[in-house]
Amino acid sequence: RLRVQIDPGQPAVITGVNVTVTGSGASEATLAALASDFPLRKGAVLVHPLYEKAKQALQSRAEELGYLDAAYAVHEVRVDEAGRSAVITLALETGQKYFFSTVAIKGAPDYPDAFLRRYLAFQPEEAFSYGRMAASQLQLNNSERFRRVIVRADKEQARDGKIPAQVILTPAPHIR
């Protein structure tokens, strides 16, 4: 039998918060708002899961806006155990913004191209978004016209920040 007693000690109080966004996404209003409204504030008790959640939310939002290379150049929480204090420093480097380029639709020759494109939640030249690709796939699936729907894009094929997308459709059997 093993008995363990843990003394968590006193919580650390946040004495400083510095959250910055750099790169081409620094001028994005939503990223600036998330950085300035970071939920952990000076004077609050450090809650690490809340820190991780807020940190992930900022990076996820950058990616949703098309900054697929967004990564933290600095992400640290310096805790002074003796002083029971913590300083949070985050620096998100967004990298370049990506956009959709061409959208190739394959596998549904019986449907006009303009008809199929109505189901897409994105257009060429719009900011790249995995969420919009997923929404497009869902809309095409929900149309019940296709047995299989694949909406994909390969960032490795990007040229000048523009990523081509493919929509691959397998029509459902015709119901008469």
Model feature map: region roles:
Residues 1-176:
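Periplasmic polypeptide-binding modules associated with outer-membrane biogenesis and secretion
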